[in-house]
């Protein structure tokens, strides 16, 4: 009798525990769902546009390929074009991957895609590079520059090189070597914890300072070693004929030089948290404010964590300090940021989030990047043929003459597989 009573009590206890456990799980899921609904407000009056799509082709990665607009009316965005192929655990792109452009002459409302002549990829993986004889006029009203490196779709030159245009990308000059072509041998890059064999992995990020002066943001990594990219800047004061190292934005980790307090809080266990210099830093977007401050937003990664950070320089790029975390770039390999300034001086940053169902996110800063708003959904109607990989984003961000923002990114829906898309909205409202 006593034994039966004990058994009944045990069964009752287990049943109560299971009910309580189930309730807690359901409540946790509900809270998570509610948090997403509360935190992720939707951008109002956002207009989505197809920039360029092509049957049986995969189009992607504007962040790797650049975007330009000198007047807020005429706009240009680069992207990678390849054959559409279903590939397990990877991007659905195969075949030859070409660097294309799309142009708009009406503030981003309509676009035309084209394969430019004398441009990236037209001269082989490691082209014979030209030496710049006549200095570039960086102040030219229709100047555009495309910087090329390696480790991303359609670009393979570990030395790095560049093209430039004086007619807003209609025609291009290049490929030119970056100075004397010995950047990887600079002592600032050699005397680090990176291996002796490195490669340059820049996208296109530069700040024009005058007719002859330009700061170019670069990244370098140990050859073929994913995640070791670190961000630095170099400067030319003679129209691109020569370049000199300016500073590290995020240097390779050096235990003897690193500030032990500069850790990134990713885990509850403090011992697991990395130093800021131990995390990948690549694919920056840098702007200059009216007061001369340089704000650089960049893609970060450590283990499974992906996020966007902002750093600031108040001495013309000579030194950099951490400013703020811009946002969470989600799962997989994360996403790089795009950054711009509204007419009212508000900073706008966008990035993709590859957590299902897939979103384009936007955040705002009204204090020069010291803090950022809660993220808002710019777009979330993602869909693909297999939905195996949430493959989206890599944005660029241009400002129209009327002050509205134009986000450019790659996207997919069930009806229109991977294509280049734009979203137009008012970043000041």
Model-derived regions: residue spans:
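N-terminal secretory signal peptides that target proteins for export/translocation
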Residues: 1-9
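Generic secretory/membrane-interface signal
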Residues: 4, 20-21, 104, 365
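In a subset of proteins, long, contiguous C-terminal domains/tails are tracked
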Residues: 5, 19-21, 423, 428-429
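Short intrinsically disordered, low-complexity segments
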Residues: 7, 17-19, 169
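Compositionally biased, low-complexity segments
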Residues: 8-9, 24, 161
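Bacterial N-terminal signal peptides
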Residues: 13-24
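Sec/Tat signal peptide C-region and signal peptidase I cleavage site
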Residues: 26-29
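Asp-box/BNR beta-propeller blade signature and adjacent active/binding-site loops
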Residues: 31-429
């Amino acid at each position: 009798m006593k034994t039966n009573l004990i058994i009944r009590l045990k069964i009752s206890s287990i049943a109560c525990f299971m009910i309580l456990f189930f309730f807690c799980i359901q409540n946790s899921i509900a809270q998570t769902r509610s948090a997403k609904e509360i935190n992720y407000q939707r951008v109002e009056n956002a207009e989505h546009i197809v920039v360029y799509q092509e049957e049986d082709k995969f189009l992607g990665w504007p962040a790797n390929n650049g975007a330009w607009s000198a007047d807020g009316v005429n706009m240009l965005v680069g992207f990678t074009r390849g054959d559409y192929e279903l590939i397990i655990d990877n991007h659905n792109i195969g075949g030859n991957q070409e660097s294309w452009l799309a142009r708009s002459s009406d503030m981003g409302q309509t676009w035309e895609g084209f394969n430019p002549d004398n441009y990236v990829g037209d001269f082989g993986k490691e082209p014979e590079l030209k030496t710049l004889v006549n200095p570039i006029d960086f102040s030219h009203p229709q100047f555009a520059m495309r910087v090329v490196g390696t480790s991303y779709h359609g670009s393979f030159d570990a030395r790095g090189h560049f093209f430039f245009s004086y007619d807003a990308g209609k025609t291009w000059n290049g490929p030119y070597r970056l100075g004397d072509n010995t950047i990887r041998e600079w002592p600032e890059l050699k005397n680090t914890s990176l291996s002796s064999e490195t490669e340059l992995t820049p996208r296109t990020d530069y700040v024009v300072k005058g007719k002859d002066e330009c700061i170019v943001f670069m990244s370098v990594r140990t050859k073929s070693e994913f995640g070791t990219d670190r961000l630095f800047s170099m400067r030319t004061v003679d129209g691109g004929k020569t370049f000199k190292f300016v500073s590290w934005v995020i240097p390779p980790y050096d235990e003897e030089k690193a500030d032990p307090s500069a850790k990134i809080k990713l885990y509850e266990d403090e011992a697991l948290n990395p130093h800021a210099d131990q995390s990948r830093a690549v694919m920056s977007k840098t702007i200059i404010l009216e007061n001369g401050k340089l704000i650089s937003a960049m893609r970060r990664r450590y283990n499974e964590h992906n996020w966007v950070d902002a750093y600031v320089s108040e001495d013309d790029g000579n030194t950099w300090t951490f400013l703020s975390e811009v946002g969470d770039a989600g799962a997989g390999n994360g996403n790089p940021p795009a950054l711009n300034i509204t007419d009212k001086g508000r900073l706008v940053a966008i990035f993709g989030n590859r957590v299902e169902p897939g979103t384009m996110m936007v955040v705002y800063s009204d204090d020069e990047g010291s803090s950022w708003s809660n993220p808002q959904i710019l777009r979330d109607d993602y869909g693909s043929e297999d939905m195996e990989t949430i493959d989206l984003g890599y944005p660029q961000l241009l400002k129209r003459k009327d002050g509205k923002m134009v986000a450019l990114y790659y996207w997919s829906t069930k009806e229109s597989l991977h294509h280049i898309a734009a979203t137009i909205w008012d970043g000041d409202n």
